[in-house]
Amino acid sequence: MTDTIRADGRTADQLRPVTIERAWNRKAEGSALVSFGGTRVLCTASFTNGVPRWMSGKGRGWVTAEYAMLPRSTNDRMDRESVKGRIGGRTHEISRLIGRSLRAVVDMKALGENTIVLDCDVLQADGGTRTAAITGAYVALADALEWGREHRFIGQKAAPLLDSVSAVSVGIVDGSPMLDLAYTEDVRAETDMNVVVTGRGLFVEVQGTAEGAPFDRSELNGLLDLALAGTTALVAVQSAALAAPAPGCEG
């Protein structure tokens, strides 16, 4: 499998170059600009003291997310969904996926009655925007939680962050299992999966579809192994980003 050379020069089991730049938005309590090759997503975390009315008085916090693509993040300009007057099904689906993925690693009781909203805006799309959004949003979330602790909205001894979380795409392209699909690979994939994994290697979500021929159990296991190797590498990128000094927000 590793002998397969892809159009961009990668081997089948190789991630695209991944970078995470923290504090990209100095106004926000947490932010990260994440790049997976040509895919770039700005993830912004907004910390609010208080929770939605339906959660008030329960002593628990809330983490949610919104996903959007800029009009010229793709080859041809598309209208903003706000101009169309409705949010598309794909946008709803991805927003909910990001929110679920982040909530999987947050202790809502330790968070207290506080709300964190993650806005994930795709600046440039070249495949894997939802997986990049999850990977970058975790870093923005971690910084927002630290901001909440520093400003005494979260207890000094509380530990709301249970683990890290990252995500990657895998698929079968031209008969070969591949990691982290670029757009030109994604549109040709016979099987396409998005896999969300915690830092400890536990699965949060597996979204898999046979676009062409159905896949068997051994192919599924191979793709999951490929995804686990990819997310292990992504955890290292996240950890390095969070260990590096970053300027604080202005808020």
Swiss-Prot record:
<comment type="function">
    <text>Phosphorolytic 3'-5' exoribonuclease that plays an important role in tRNA 3'-end maturation. Removes nucleotide residues following the 3'-CCA terminus of tRNAs; can also add nucleotides to the ends of RNA molecules by using nucleoside diphosphates as substrates, but this may not be physiologically important. Probably plays a role in initiation of 16S rRNA degradation (leading to ribosome degradation) during starvation.</text>
</comment>
<comment type="similarity">
    <text>Belongs to the RNase PH family.</text>
</comment>
<dbReference type="InterPro" id="IPR036345">
    <property type="entry name" value="ExoRNase_PH_dom2_sf"/>
</dbReference>
<keyword id="KW-0694">RNA-binding</keyword>
<dbReference type="InterPro" id="IPR020568">
    <property type="entry name" value="Ribosomal_Su5_D2-typ_SF"/>
</dbReference>
<dbReference type="InterPro" id="IPR027408">
    <property type="entry name" value="PNPase/RNase_PH_dom_sf"/>
</dbReference>
<dbReference type="GO" id="GO:0009022">
    <property type="term" value="F:tRNA nucleotidyltransferase activity"/>
</dbReference>
<dbReference type="InterPro" id="IPR050080">
    <property type="entry name" value="RNase_PH"/>
</dbReference>
<dbReference type="GO" id="GO:0000175">
    <property type="term" value="F:3'-5'-RNA exonuclease activity"/>
</dbReference>
<keyword id="KW-0548">Nucleotidyltransferase</keyword>
<feature type="binding site">
    <location>
        <position position="90"/>
    </location>
    <ligand>
        <name>phosphate</name>
    </ligand>
</feature>
<keyword id="KW-0819">tRNA processing</keyword>
<keyword id="KW-0698">rRNA processing</keyword>
<dbReference type="InterPro" id="IPR015847">
    <property type="entry name" value="ExoRNase_PH_dom2"/>
</dbReference>
<dbReference type="InterPro" id="IPR002381">
    <property type="entry name" value="RNase_PH_bac-type"/>
</dbReference>
<dbReference type="GO" id="GO:0016075">
    <property type="term" value="P:rRNA catabolic process"/>
</dbReference>
<keyword id="KW-0820">tRNA-binding</keyword>
<feature type="binding site">
    <location>
        <begin position="128"/>
        <end position="130"/>
    </location>
    <ligand>
        <name>phosphate</name>
    </ligand>
</feature>
<dbReference type="GO" id="GO:0006364">
    <property type="term" value="P:rRNA processing"/>
</dbReference>
<dbReference type="InterPro" id="IPR001247">
    <property type="entry name" value="ExoRNase_PH_dom1"/>
</dbReference>
<comment type="subunit">
    <text>Homohexameric ring arranged as a trimer of dimers.</text>
</comment>
<dbReference type="InterPro" id="IPR018336">
    <property type="entry name" value="RNase_PH_CS"/>
</dbReference>
<dbReference type="Pfam" id="PF01138">
    <property type="entry name" value="RNase_PH"/>
</dbReference>
<dbReference type="GO" id="GO:0000049">
    <property type="term" value="F:tRNA binding"/>
</dbReference>
<protein>
    <recommendedName>
        <fullName>Ribonuclease PH</fullName>
        <ecNumber>2.7.7.56</ecNumber>
    </recommendedName>
</protein>
<keyword id="KW-0808">Transferase</keyword>
<dbReference type="GO" id="GO:0008033">
    <property type="term" value="P:tRNA processing"/>
</dbReference>
<dbReference type="Pfam" id="PF03725">
    <property type="entry name" value="RNase_PH_C"/>
</dbReference>
